[in-house]
């Protein structure tokens, strides 16, 4: 066995007709008389190894009969192309050995398990074909994010995880002790990217962010990853163009490189292929009109006169976003929300001071907001008034106001949540499967 090369399952096509060694974990096993069918996975994929008793002898055949799920094994055999399925290969096994047996029955058996059980065993659940496919797609999305910004002249600038102040209240921040001072885990690197944009013109940060929200929805995690670009001399229109190009690039990359994984997930790739420019761009007022049309129809169908119209000036909830995005086959951009529901640093619309020059991008199929951004306020006096109006501590923003004191400039940017994007592209019902070890309201382990 030592005389044969150890190869990965991803390289089988180059070794058809050759005898090789495969090394990995026993994913599944079934037997039929004098044949064993061993499914081996090695981290790159899986392959079926067909073992005939006549080819390996009684001792090896008996050892294969006893091997348990997820034992580490070597299988030696000839690589053969599947007679009916193009691109699929099998191993005609001629040798076998166990390198690392399991300590008893593997906890995740082929039977159905509940979500809580699987999350308790997340460290093992990652080995399943479905989870493997999801995290492969996640990897490709992250790679595409970096390639997109690298290809457009952006500089990666790391934002701090510890922040010294609670800029927008402490209700959704994780507080910790920092050498005797109060510190908070970051919710966003955006303010720091504004400083970086003044230094580099085009900058982005990419890292974990933390929200202490008491939310148990399918869209919320306490810890998630976000990429936040910021560009000098860019306005809201340019910001929307950048976001549109960005999402198209990511989806195209996944379709190009991860179709086998999408097939494992039974994802309707036709819905992803529809993600093409231009995206519909509607104002907040138009989105409210869509909601009110839906509510009017609901009143008519259900005969419930007490269903009110959507109140202008409120932010959209998850159900609202689902209704709005349901009108379109691709992401929809909603811009110019009421300033009262957006952050203090958003620039006001010069034609209507009630509105912010902001944009949210809603993914189709009810996946909700995946991008939020806008143009930042670049006037010092206006920003000072906004900080005061939001009852924020002005001393905490001295460095941020310096960006307006010393060479102020128009700029814009956005943030994209990786996990929501993975959920949308993979077609998942919940974000908990989009990150290797999710942190949620009632889950801190494993």
Curated annotation (Swiss-Prot):
SUPFAM superfamilies recorded: Class II aaRS and biotin synthetases, Nucleic acid-binding proteins
PROSITE patterns for this protein: AA_TRNA_LIGASE_II (PS50862)
Catalytic reactions of this protein: tRNA(Asn) + L-asparagine + ATP = L-asparaginyl-tRNA(Asn) + AMP + diphosphate + H(+)
Location of this chain's protein in the cell: Cytoplasm
HAMAP family tied to this protein: Asn_tRNA_synth
Family per record: Belongs to the class-II aminoacyl-tRNA synthetase family.
Subunit composition and interactions: Homodimer.
Protein name: Asparagine--tRNA ligase
Gene name, Swiss-Prot/TrEMBL: asnS
